[in-house]
Regions:
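Active-site diphosphate/adenylate-binding microenvironment
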Residues: 8-11, 16-18, 26-36, 350-441
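N-terminal alpha/beta PP-like core and its mobile active-site loop of ThDP/TPP-dependent enzymes
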Residues: 2-340, 473-476
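Active-site phosphate/pyrophosphate- and oxyanion-stabilizing loops and adjacent acidic/basic residues
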Residues: 59, 126-127, 232, 377, ...
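Short acidic loop-to-helix transition motifs that present clustered carboxylates
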Residues: 31, 51-56, 78, 396-398, ...
């Protein structure tokens, strides 16, 4: 092996070392020479129709694979992707954004170059990126470039957030020492010092042993912090009643007998919220306390009775214990925990059992219209172990909270960024990562299944072309309710601005060049207006197999929406109008008073 290699070869081989196998992006004159290094480094080039979709797809890939990379060109390219990168920051997806930039001498000379603002300032876009990434590097110095790359990649993986790397065109072929590649980047999660966590472990265990009515809530950052297995084991071993948030759905095994669906606060089961408020111990893992994820802030537990696990600190009874890494802390708790001392508490079935509710549903009539009220439960019979299930922002993400998931499934939704159109390109990235990992024996066999609204699909429809180009297996249920239904419920039920142009959705695969009658990549398209039609479609072997591109258009009425959505939008409307200002509470106000004031 040569003693020195080109800087871009070093960069791409590092990406391969940390587990990335494919690169998303769009070619541009500032990154073209860099793209020549992708295949020699053992990476695949995806090639997206636009940069926004490339960013969304990289995010979806990262949520399955753990980390991803997207390449754009300076200025016009990177700004097209910035919405996606901001979403990755907000929801903690590890995306490496590589930007091909103008040569260093051009930048230093303030030359009026294309794709710039024409003012000679080549730093403005990097300054924007710094607000939505956890680490940045401008690879200008050959002596420090490799260390800068390693620093950014390490930060991306360990902090579960995007990073930004600038690669000037005149640095692409700069020679750097090859031997650095022999030492892998340390991506291990930090361990707590021996004995350092003992006090906190004992404090937590004693609270668990003495509790009379315990409750576990698993939230979405649990997976980002790398503690999904520990959370699942805690749920299984304790037998404590467990729920998830919307963002946390699918992280723990939902077939456990002590799993009671989603805790929806003021928008959910009327008996669940009073019961949860009466718990003397709430263990919350990986919290994201956004308005959407907490149902208008109504599910945030009282700090005095809570143990909350963050990435590198824990809150016990409202007291913050710093520099405690949750993975190490949870492993110690699980190792030391005496299950015989735990309370043997069995909650009432009134708290909800999704599987029992699904089994109790009476079969619909053949000619009955497909409805939001039961669709999400009934469609759960279509799922199997290993599936990746994705629900787009809107009625699909809210309805998807009622899905009944088998073991070993993954559910992807958005619970703070909520950029409609995200899920279609994200499904491309997720399906690609799934295919890679199944081939490596790292995932169960399964399908990628997307529930996409008609309005959302129109935002990012070119992603269908990317799916077809890469021959990915994706099953898409297009929920056609003739416009922006969630916006109608928030404001403007009959307003024209919530209407969209009707499309012939099932003709999209043909328009985007999908093959016809190719057994290696089958294309399946069907339309359902009634339950009889939908059930017949769901039973078709081609759809069950999930190979190739499958599109099922599901017709629903324009104003039909999940009941929980109708409850949520009432508080959203009041908050948006200014009727609900964040309260100035006295120190004597109870936690419940504070929460309900905020929630409205």
């Amino acid at each position: 092996m040569a003693t020195h290699i080109d800087l871009t070869e070093f960069l791409f081989r590092r990406l391969r070392q940390i587990g990335i196998k494919a690169i998303h992006g769009v070619p541009g004159d500032y990154n073209l020479t860099a793209l020549d290094y992708i295949e020699p480094a053992g990476l695949d080039w995806v090639g997206n129709a636009n940069e926004l979709n490339a960013g969304y797809a990289a995010d979806g890939y990262a949520r399955i694979r753990g980390v991803s990379a997207v390449i754009t060109a300076f200025g016009v390219g990177e700004l097209s992707a910035i919405n996606a990168i901001a979403g990755s920051y907000a929801e903690r997806a590890s995306v490496i954004h590589i930007v091909g930039t103008a040569p260093t001498h051009v930048q230093d000379g303030g030359v009026c170059m294309h794709h710039s603002l024409g003012d000679g300032n080549f730093r403005i876009f990097a300054e924007m990126a710094a607000k939505i990434t956890v680490a940045q590097a401008n690879l200008r110095n050959p002596d420090t470039a490799t260390a800068e790359i390693d620093r950014c990649l390490q930060a991306c993986v360990l902090q579960s957030r995007p990073v930004y790397i600038e690669l000037p065109t005149n640095m692409v072929k700069v020679r750097v020492p090859a031997a650095i590649l022999d030492k892998p980047i340390d991506l291990s999660l930090p361990e707590n010092d021996e004995g350092f966590e003992d006090t906190e472990v004992d404090l937590i265990l004693n609270k668990m042993y003495s509790s009379k009515q315990p409750f576990i809530v698993v939230d979405g950052f649990t997976s980002r912090y790398g503690i999904g297995e520990e959370a699942d084991e805690l749920v299984r071993l304790t037998g404590f009643p467990t729920s998830t948030t919307p963002f946390g759905k699918g992280i723990v095994n939902e077939t456990y007998p002590n799993f009671h669906g989603m805790y929806a606060g003021m928008a959910g089961n009327l008996k669940y919220m009073p019961w949860a408020r009466g718990c003397d111990l709430v263990i919350k893992i990986g919290p994201l306390d956004s308005d959407v994820n907490t149902f208008g802030f109504s599910t945030i537990p009282d700090p005095k009775s809570s143990i909350v696990f963050h990435r590198d600190y824990v809150e016990i009874g409202g007291v913050k214990y710093e520099n405690l890494h949750s993975k190490s802390l949870l492993r110690k708790i699980l190792t030391k925990m005496d299950t015989d001392r735990l309370p043997k508490y069995k909650p009432s079935m009134d708290l909800g059992n999704l599987r029992a509710q699904l089994q109790a549903l009476l079969p619909p009539g053949e000619d009955d219209q497909i409805d939001q009220a039961t669709f999400w439960q009934r469609i759960s019979n279509f799922f199997r172990e290993g599936d990746i299930i994705m629900t787009e922002t809107g009625t699909t993400s809210v309805g998807g909270r009622d899905l009944v998931l088998p073991a070993h499934t993954t559910l992807i939704n958005s619970s703070i960024w909520l950029s409609i159109g995200y899920m279609l390109p994200a499904s491309q990235g997720a399906a690609l990562a799934q295919r890679e990992m199944i081939a490596e024996g790292k995932r169960h066999q399964g399908r990628t299944i997307l529930f996409e609204g008609d309005g959302s699909l129109q935002m990012t429809a070119q992603a269908l072309s990317d799916i077809i180009r890469n021959r990915l297996d994706v099953t898409i249920f297009v929920i056609n309710n003739d416009g922006y239904t969630i916006e109608r419920w928030i404001h403007g039920m009959k307003a024209g601005y919530n209407d969209i142009q009707p499309w012939r959705y099932l003709e999209a695969p043909s328009y985007f060049g999908a093959p016809k009658d190719d057994p290696a990549y089958p294309v399946f398209t069907k339309r359902a207006e009634t339950w009889g039609q939908l059930n017949a479609i769901l039973a078709e072997p081609a759809l069950q197999a999930g190979k190739g591109l499958n599109m099922v258009e599901v017709i629903m009425t324009q104003e039909d929406a999940p009941e929980v959505l109708k409850k949520l939008v009432q508080s959203t409307s009041r908050r948006n109008s200014g009727e609900m200002e964040r309260p100035k509470m006295s120190g004597t106000a109870s936690h419940e008073e504070k929460v309900m004031k905020i929630a409205g």
